[in-house]
Amino acid sequence: MKALLIVASALLAFGAQAGPAEDAMTKAGCMACHAKDKKLVGHAFKDIAAKYKGQDAVAKLMEKVRKGGSGSFGPIPMSPNSVEKINDADLKAAVEVILKS
């Protein structure tokens, strides 16, 4: 049931045409806290994209996802995400999708 809710959330967040990056974000649990266009526990992908617009932020955001932390968007900390949870290639693709939101 939990998996069904996560998949349904991802489809709502990204539309029916979810690609590999969106699938990786769903499997890694990103969609439990984030959505494309509204704040949940974590900030909306569109807000993250707006904050880093015009910057070469892929490596910076990949590090933030890996290490976790707080302070970038407020006091709620982001949990660290290991390579076992989302591999480097999927993480890079996911961050690129987020920055295009």
Segments from the language model and where they lie:
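Classic N-terminal secretory signal peptides
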Residues: 1-18
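Sequence/structural segment immediately N-terminal to covalent heme-attachment motifs in c-type
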Residues: 19-36
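Flexible gly/pro/ser-rich segments immediately N-terminal to CXXCH heme-c attachment motifs
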Residues: 25, 49-52
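Axial heme c-ligation environment in periplasmic c-type cytochrome domains
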Residues: 32, 40-50, 66-93
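Short microdomains enriched in Cys/His and/or Lys/Arg
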Residues: 51-62
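Aromatic- and Gly/Pro-enriched helix-to-coil junctions and flexible linker segments
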Residues: 94-101
